[in-house]
Swiss-Prot record:
This is CD166 antigen. Residues 569-583 have a biased composition (Basic and acidic residues). Residues 550-583 are cytoplasmic. The gene is Alcam. InterPro entries: CD80_C2-set, Ig-like_dom, Ig-like_dom_sf, Ig-like_fold, Ig_sub, Surface_Rcpt/Adhesion_Mol. The CD6 binding site is located in the N-terminal Ig-like domain.
Length: 583
């Protein structure tokens, strides 16, 4: 016969059965929390009228419970179980909401809220999920450079402290990189910190670059799950130096090759379009089969015209990859014959030649006493006015600074030549006597009166121009006198005399010499007259030819008319004879 148990035993038994079996119908409830935040878990149960107390527990992986918090409905007191990982982290409110501060990865568990009455136990499970945003990904262990046609490690993309773990993606210019055999290789790995349970993700990229990757940005991203869903964080851009071989060689000349002249320094610069550019080249000079090894520049100093020719440079290890250029060293030679100081006698012949030798057509300018001449000088018979400083100057317009000049200082000497003239003043009270002197060096003039032999100092002289000048005196002689003019220079002493009648005796005046300026005017007038006469003669000749052609044509026409008239007369006579015969 079975005995009946006590009421307390019966209650404990019912509670155990309820805790183990009775799980009223609330479904799973999930609370998402960020790492380090406070986890708040409502009980989600209606508080019954006869509530004795409330408890929170979590379940171990094997299903065994661990109680962590207790609150009595009557004493309003809270008790926390001695669980080391939750010490000083728990808070249980009056409505049995459990809060856990400083959320950790280890808090990812199934927590259960239990409300206990005298005859029942009510439970509401809550699943806690903890998320940790990973650090911003960064590209580390970057390659110093990438080489074309070589599969080489570009770098590692690393993102730390993530929970749960995330995925890393590589991008080239914003487009996703996918593994391609021999061209793109991606190796992903993740590690978990035993203490924090946080993940570190690393993705290594090996990449075969091309020249199209120059200045192309590479990035990576990490995609992870957070409390609000999936998110992505991008790294900073990384741009890599792309190494590629030289495909073309160019050669430059400094200064520009169209302006090189003798005496200049020439620098040849050879460039390759590879990266990095070649540092050394072979330079080949005109007429030299062997090259000269140098850096990317080679300098020739004080070049001469024989440096004109073809210059070439090439890569050290690829002689067929070369470039060439033609250099012309411009030159300009000038030879003036005669040059320097030349002394000639008046009337002499002096041929002058200015010979130019240049790398291209040069301009030639003649100057006399700083005045430009229209043509080069030529002296078939030297005059005093031909004396002066002559300069032959030549230049190459295309080449700055290339000009030459030579000078000729021409001295025309002559013995003194004298001509004396006299002229009576219209008033008849005085006479002007002029001594015209020509010669070089400038002759000195002296006047004397025959008889007395006295020297006359009261004279007036003209300027000495082109080897000529004159000296004049004005006298009023009471009797006939003879005036003597003496001209002397380093070459000779010349004397001339002139008889002058007394003022009371009329005499014929002698005309003055024509000055150089007047002589030129006379020559110009003579040329003009000759031109007019020649023009008139040509006009008369043309008129004569036209008249002759006209007369010839007129005579021909007259013959034709007379012939026609004769034929008409003959026809008339024939008609008359015919009439007579019929009668």
């Amino acid at each position: 016969m079975a005995s009946k148990g006590s009421p307390s035993c019966r209650l404990v038994f019912c509670l155990l059965i309820s805790a183990a079996v009775l799980r009223p119908g609330l479904g799973w409830y999930t609370v998402n929390s960020a790492y380090g935040d406070t986890i708040v878990m409502p009980c989600r149960l209606d508080v019954p009228q006869n509530l004795m107390f409330g408890k929170w527990k979590y379940e171990k992986p094997d299903g065994s419970p661990v109680f962590i918090a207790f609150r009595s409905s009557t004493k309003k007191s809270v008790q926390y179980d001695d669980v080391p990982e939750y010490k000083d982290r728990l808070s249980l409110s009056e409505n049995y909401t459990l809060s856990i501060n400083n959320a950790k990865i280890s808090d990812e568990k199934r927590f259960v809220c239990m409300l206990v009455t005298e005859d029942n136990v009510f439970e509401a499970p809550t699943l806690v999920k903890v998320f940790k945003q990973p650090s911003k990904p960064e590209i580390v262990n970057r390659a110093a450079f990438l080489e074309t046609e070589q599969l080489k490690k570009l770098g590692d993309c690393i993102s730390r402290d993530s929970y749960p773990d995330g995925n890393i993606t590589w991008y080239r210019n914003g487009k996703v990189l996918q593994p391609v055999d021999g061209e793109v290789s991606i190796l992903f790995k993740k590690e978990i910190d035993p203490g924090t349970q946080l993940y570190t993700m690393t993705s290594s990229l090996e990449y075969k670059t091309t020249k199209s990757d120059i200045q192309m940005p590479f990035t990576c991203s990490v995609t992870y799950y957070g409390p609000s869903g999936q998110k992505t964080i991008y790294s900073e851009q990384a741009i890599f130096d792309i190494y590629y071989p030289t495909e073309q060689v160019t050669i430059q000349v400094l200064p520009p090759k169209n302006a090189i002249k003798e005496g200049d320094n020439i620098t040849l610069q050879c460039l390759g379009n590879g990266n990095p550019p070649p540092e050394e080249f072979m330079f080949y000079l005109p007429g030299q089969a062997e090259g000269i090894r140098s850096s990317n520049t080679y300098t020739l100093t004080d070049v001469r015209r024989n440096a004109t020719g073809d210059y070439k440079c090439s890569l050290i290890d690829q002689r067929n990859m070369a470039a060439s250029t033609t250099i012309t060293v411009h030159y300009l030679d000038l030879s003036l014959n005669p040059s320097g100081e030349v002394t000639k006698q008046i009337g002499d012949t002096l041929p002058v030649s200015c010979t130019i030798s240049a790398s291209r057509n040069a301009t030639v300018v003649w100057m006399k006493d700083n005045i430009r001449l229209r043509s080069s000088p030529s002296f078939s018979s030297l005059h005093y006015q031909d004396a002066g400083n002559y300069v032959c100057e030549t230049a190459l317009q295309e080449v700055e600074g290339l000009k030459k000049r030579e000078s000729l200082t021409l001295i025309v000497e002559g013995k003194p030549q004298i001509k004396m003239t006299k002229k009576t003043d219209p008033s008849g009270l005085s006479k002007t006597i002029i001594c015209h002197v020509e010669g070089f060096p400038k002759p000195a003039i002296q006047w004397t009166i025959t008889g007395s032999g006295s020297v006359i100092n009261q004279t007036e002289e003209s300027p000495y121009i082109n080897g000529r000048y004159y000296s004049k005196i004005i006298i009023s002689p009471e009797e006939n006198v003879t005036l003597t003019c003496t001209a002397e220079n380093q070459l000779e002493r010349t004397v001339n005399s002139l008889n002058v009648s007394a003022i009371s005796i009329p005499e014929h005046d002698e005309a003055d010499d024509i000055s150089d300026e007047n002589r030129e005017k006379v020559n110009d007038q003579a040329k003009l007259i000759v031109g007019i006469v020649v023009g008139l003669l040509l006009a008369a000749l043309v008129a004569g030819v036209v008249y002759w052609l006209y007369m010839k044509k007129s005579k021909t026409a007259s013959k034709h008319v007379n012939k026609d008239l004769g034929n008409m007369e003959e026809n008339k006579k024939l008609e008359e004879n015919n009439h007579k015969t019929e009668a």
